[in-house]
Swiss-Prot record:
Residues engaged in binding a divalent metal cation 1: 130, 132, 213, 234
Coiled-coil positions: none
Protein name: RNase aCSPSF2
UniProt GO molecular function: exonuclease activity; metal ion binding; RNA endonuclease activity
Keyword match Transcription: no
Organism this protein belongs to: Saccharolobus solfataricus (strain ATCC 35092 / DSM 1617 / JCM 11322 / P2) (Sulfolobus solfataricus)
Binding sites annotated in the UniProt record for a divalent metal cation 2: 134-135, 234, 460
Keyword set includes Cell membrane: no
Signal sequence residues: none
Family that this chain belongs to: Belongs to the metallo-beta-lactamase superfamily. RNA-metabolizing metallo-beta-lactamase-like family.
SUPFAM superfamilies for this protein: Metallo-hydrolase/oxidoreductase
Annotated InterPro entries: Beta_Casp, MBL, Metallo-B-lactamas, RibonucZ/Hydroxyglut_hydro, RMMBL
Pfam families (UniProt xref): Beta-Casp, Lactamase_B_6, RMMBL
Keywords: Exonuclease, Hydrolase, Magnesium, Metal-binding, Nuclease, Zinc
Amino acid sequence: MPMTFVFITVGFSITIFFSLVSIITLVAFICSVFIPILSIFFRSEGFIFAITCFIEEEVNLIVCGYDISQMNYFLKILGGGREVGRSAIEVGNSDGSIILDYGVNFDEKDNPNFPLQEMPGKVKGFVVSHAHLDHIGALPIYQIGSLNTKVYGTVATRIITETMLKDFLKLSGAKIPYEWVEVRKTMDNFMAIGYGEEVEIDSLKVSLYNAGHIPGSSIIKVSSEKGVIAFTGDINLTETKLMKPAEIENIGDANVLVMESTYGKFNHPNRKDVENDFYDKVMEVVESGGTVLVPAFSLARSQEVLSVLAERNFPYPVYYDGMSREITEIMLGFKEFLNRPDLLKKAYDNFNYVKGWEDRHRAWKEKGVIVASAGMLKGGPAVYYFKKLSENSKNAVFLVSYQAINTPGRKLLEMGKFDEYSGLLKARLEIFDFSSHAGRRQLLEIVKSVKDLEKVVLVHGSPDNESSLADLIKQEIGVEVITPENGQEISL
């Protein structure tokens, strides 16, 4: 009997062992076949997000019954901390949060850097300040797989965002973790709201006001029973041809101000003086038989330059190339977001859009002005024109955009040549401050306009710009100023 029991036990154990081996083998086979397929379909980020969402939902079924009035709110820097671009600011409490902007910036090799990610099930929505890539370039990540996160912004921002994301995907598709389907879902989930309109997202109330930066740009005001947060996004108090000044009177009741600091160390020259200087020097070059290349961002800077030339009835040919025509047509469809739509329409009607290589060849052969992207000469038709025009001392390259470190535009300013392998530039080189960001004095003015301010959080600036501006604010106003790193959480 004992021996029989032993044989039965051993036999049973062997059966269980081989059954387990079979199950493990089957599971391994299924994983080897289906997980790659799922990964291709969702991509790694989406697959992880989907699993995370499922786990979070299960946890939320168990943990519930929060009293919102007892919750502590926080602000977390997911991007834009002591750096320019990659803007991403999370605001919320333990029950959920919203994210203000979700953009990218680029490394030395032009690879996109993405913000930190929050648990997807926790994020109740995104609110977008404007449609520059450093504020919207990462939004589709939260549409991967089963995710359908709502996005809020002005109608102009919505339409321009679609154009910008399509172009980003076309140029950098292999370097980014989403595809066209996620861009499409982003736009399907994008809710347009007007200036002054208030929407509720979970326990927070959100409203938008003109930020004066580009058409559709917004200051974002977030209100709860605990207080008010104002996020400037990119902001400008200077009237330009394209934009009216920011409406900072609408955020005077903020308790916490999250503010950009791109030009925290610098003041901008008088805008009218810049426009006059630019026009006079363009005329000098053209009337001497030369051609002026103006590398400019397709979104806003190109339209600003074209409007300046249109206002003065520039008597020579003007060509514009790149995505600027599509953006211009969008802007003309939303004239309520423009300061001088008449000037932009005049430029659109009278200046020459480059439709192909025949037009491109004609443009650089004529004495006149060419406005072309990209603004930092990192690519686009501007590089073609630069190569054609740079060897002739009669011609000129007039920079009107911010030139980031390690870009060809910055190298031109620092070394006088396009890159380490090029010869010295023979054409005339000038730079003009057509900035659409507030300077040091204006940033201080914004802070002073807020009456019950408890703290200022500086973002979207290099460490030296943030530190310099922080010192000024402390000295002039005496309020607490924080210059956070990415990942830092601030209790409110």
